[in-house]
Swiss-Prot record:
Encoding gene (name): GET1
Lumenal topological segments: 1-9, 138-161
Protein's name according to its UniProt entry: Golgi to ER traffic protein 1
Membrane-spanning intervals of the chain: 10-29, 117-137, 162-178
HAMAP family for the chain: Get1 (MF_03113)
Protein's membrane topology: Multi-pass membrane protein
UniProt GO MF annotations: protein-membrane adaptor activity
Keyword annotations of the record: Coiled coil, Endoplasmic reticulum, ER-Golgi transport, Golgi apparatus, Membrane, Transmembrane, Transmembrane helix, Transport
GO biological process, one term: vesicle-mediated transport
Length: 205
């Protein structure tokens, strides 16, 4: 039932590990927050009272905030103060409604974690067990010394072949390096430290 060609196993494992790296780059918390946001929208459209009220309050909060930012506190102080009080009140109501739905948010987060595990961790462990003796491909004769071929065949493959264990190790190494480079590129550059002022330098002397 679960028998696959070696080429299909190679592609399957690559896709699963690539998804795992993408999830790591995005972050589980970010994914949970986005799915929760979509869930609240869907629940409000479905008529869930708490989420309907939460969606309405959020829309009103955004509207009041735009109005508040559009006027000057100095020129229209009375109107700005009124909007500011209204904003604070709405913000408090939104927080209260969000807390009222916290139990449902926890359930959604749990389901997201289960979905991530089912998408990444479960297929990897299943493949390690089910396809542990499958030779994914064979090395050309005498490309490596015998002891290297023997190591690459560990722990279940005949010498000269490459199995899932070594293939996954190689893929993880490449994808981890790629993940590091992407994170490094996306991080904000560190500013060059400023040279100490002349007075500070003299003081130290």
């Amino acid at each position: 039932m679960f028998e696959l060609q070696p080429s299909s196993i190679v592609v399957l494992v690559f896709c699963v590990l690539a998804i795992k790296v993408c999830i790591s780059l995005i972050g589980k918390t970010t994914i949970q927050d986005r799915i929760w946001y979509l869930y609240t929208i869907g629940a409000s459209k479905a008529g869930h009272s708490k989420f309907v009220a939460l969606a309405q309050k959020r829309e009103e909060l955004v509207r009041v905030n735009k109005e508040r930012r559009a006027i000057s506190a100095q020129d229209e102080y009375a109107k700005w103060t009124k909007l500011n009080r209204q904003f604070d009140k709405l913000n408090s109501e939104v927080n209260d409604l969000a807390e009222a739905t916290s139990s449902e948010k926890a359930q959604i987060s749990k389901l997201v974690n289960l979905a991530i595990a089912a998408t990444t961790t479960a297929p990897i462990w299943f493949s390690r067990i089910w396809y542990r003796k499958v030779v994914l491909f064979y090395l050309p004769p005498k490309v490596f010394p015998y002891y290297i071929e023997w190591v690459l065949a560990l722990p279940f493959i005949v010498t000269g072949g490459v199995g899932l264990t070594v293939w996954m190790f190689a893929l993880n190494s490449v994808l981890s390096s790629l993940e590091f480079l992407i994170k490094f590129y996306l991080e904000e550059p560190v500013k060059k430290p400023e040279a100490p002022a002349a007075s500070e330098a003299q003081t130290k002397q």
